[in-house]
Every structure is written in structure tokens, then in C-alpha cells.
Curated annotation (Swiss-Prot):
Organism: Oryctolagus cuniculus (Rabbit)
Keyword RNA-binding applies: no
Function: Galactose-specific lectin which binds IgE. May mediate with the alpha-3, beta-1 integrin the stimulation by CSPG4 of endothelial cells migration. Together with DMBT1, required for terminal differentiation of columnar epithelial cells during early embryogenesis. In the nucleus: acts as a pre-mRNA splicing factor. Involved in acute inflammatory responses including neutrophil activation and adhesion, chemoattraction of monocytes macrophages, opsonization of apoptotic neutrophils, and activation of mast cells.
Annotated region (7 X 9 AA tandem repeats of Y-P-G-X(3)-P-[GS]-A), positions in chain: 35-98
The name this protein goes by in its record: Galectin-3
Highest rank taxon of the organism: Eukaryota
Length: 242
């Protein structure tokens, strides 16, 4: 199965010191006064840093003019992403077509448009907080009424916590894939990142790789909407190319 980078490579950067001017690798954020490390707004997950899968180093130089793959928000030249929370300017970052970021609180359920569908190296980031007495939450990558990728953490299924992944075509659900590793906590903030690869979705939660789900729908360009639902307070939803 093809893969743009191995999981070991993706997670190998966690011990490197942070680059100047941008938050360091996830999990190594210095604490900011009065808030979570790296939190840019109330409800942001600790160390919220869009634009990189956990531990992934930027593929290009840092961050010279027009450097391909430079971290978003760096003063490397025109067209770079703005810093988190700042408005975008003219000349979007090359390859970031499209980039969408909505800062909350957002209504739930919430639909995030994915114009042009999903594609390899697209990174979707969802930030929020699990509500007290939560039962479930769900991400649904949709093609019309079909669901290409259903990501469904369940907090109490027969007194167990489990994550269920599946695909729905013509109103018929396929074979469930279940994950017992459960990184979500009642009342706690979370960050979900979904990285699209040629053959699969990678999912990371709270800065750590969680699971991989092989594509069951092969035409990725038809997957043009992400539905977010469940017992959460939704702070932000965004997508970008990395």
C-alpha cells in the first residue's frame, strides 16, 4: 500500500527543538501565561498548530522566500499562510487550494465544505471540547448522501469506550472497523487531524497518531463535504494542503 511517509518518519520529529518564531513539535509546547501551551483562543487545544501531521518535518527549507513546505505563518515571503487567528492576505500559499478555516464557537452539527474534494496531502483539523455527559461524536466525509469515511468515537457502548469507522454507500453501511484506543475525555479539549493519503486516511488526536482507514471510495474528488456532529463544543474547523 502506497504511503507518502512512514508512521515512524511522521512521529520521529517529536524530540527536535522548536524552530524560532513558530510553535515547536506537538507535545513540546512551552506553557503560555494563563492558558494552554500555544493556545490561540479560548477552547483551542494545547499547542494547536495547523499545517503539519504529528511529528512531520516540513519538506522544504526554513522558511526562505517562497520555500516550498515552509510552516504556515512564517515571514518567508508573499503568499505564506497568516499566523493562527490572523486574516488571510492576497496570494494564498502555493498548493493551498482551497484553504478554509472557521473559528468558533461553531454550531453543531456543522458542515465544512471541501471544494474540489479531498486529495493526498490535504490536512483537516478539528478543534473542540467534549461536553459533560457526552455519548458520541462523529466526523463524516461525504459524497452526496454516501459517507466515504465515518469516524465515530462512542463514550458508552455497552459500558465501553470505542471508536467505530465505516463507509456508507446507497444507505448501506459496510464492515465496521473498531479501535479500542480512546484518547477523548469528558469535558476536555481535543484536536482531531485527518491527513489524506493516496490509499488511506490517517487520523491523529491530541498530537498522536491514532488510526489509519483505507479508502473504500476511490474517487476522492467526489468527497466534498465534512459533517461534524455529536456532543461537542466546536471551536474551529479547517483544511489546508501540506
Amino acid at each position: 500500500m502506497a504511503d507518502g511517509f512512514s508512521l515512524n518518519d511522521a512521529l520521529s520529529g517529536s524530540g527536535h527543538p522548536p524552530n524560532q518564531g513558530w510553535p515547536g513539535p506537538w507535545g513540546n509546547q512551552p506553557a503560555g501565561p494563563g492558558g494552554y501551551p500555544g493556545a490561540a483562543y479560548p477552547g483551542a487545544y494545547p499547542g494547536h498548530a495547523p499545517g503539519a501531521y504529528p511529528g512531520q518535518a516540513p519538506p522544504g527549507p526554513y522558511p526562505g522566500p517562497g520555500a516550498h513546505g515552509a510552516y504556515p505563518g512564517q515571514p518567508g515571503g508573499p503568499g505564506a499562510y497568516p499566523s493562527p487567528g490572523q486574516p488571510s492576505g492576497a496570494g494564498a500559499y502555493p498548493g493551498a487550494s482551497p484553504y478554509s478555516a472557521s473559528a468558533g464557537p461553531l454550531p453543531v452539527p456543522y458542515d465544512l465544505p471541501l471544494p474540489g474534494g479531498v486529495m493526498p496531502r490535504m490536512l483537516i483539523t478539528i478543534v473542540g471540547t467534549v461536553k459533560p455527559n457526552a455519548n458520541r461524536l462523529a466526523l463524516d466525509f461525504k459524497r452526496g448522501n454516501d459517507v466515504a469515511f465515518h469516524f465515530n468515537p462512542r463514550f458508552n457502548e455497552n459500558n465501553r469506550r470505542v471508536i467505530v469507522c465505516n463507509t456508507k454507500v446507497d444507505n448501506n453501511w459496510g464492515r465496521e472497523e473498531r479501535q479500542t484506543t480512546f484518547p477523548f475525555e469528558i469535558g476536555k479539549p481535543f484536536k482531531i487531524q485527518v491527513l489524506v493519503e493516496p490509499d488511506h486516511f490517517k487520523v491523529a488526536v491530541n498530537d498522536a497518531h491514532l488510526l489509519q482507514y483505507n479508502h473504500r471510495m476511490r474517487n476522492l474528488k467526489e468527497i466534498n463535504k465534512l459533517g461534524i456532529s455529536g456532543d461537542i463544543q466546536l471551536t474551529s474547523a479547517s483544511h489546508a494542503m501540506i
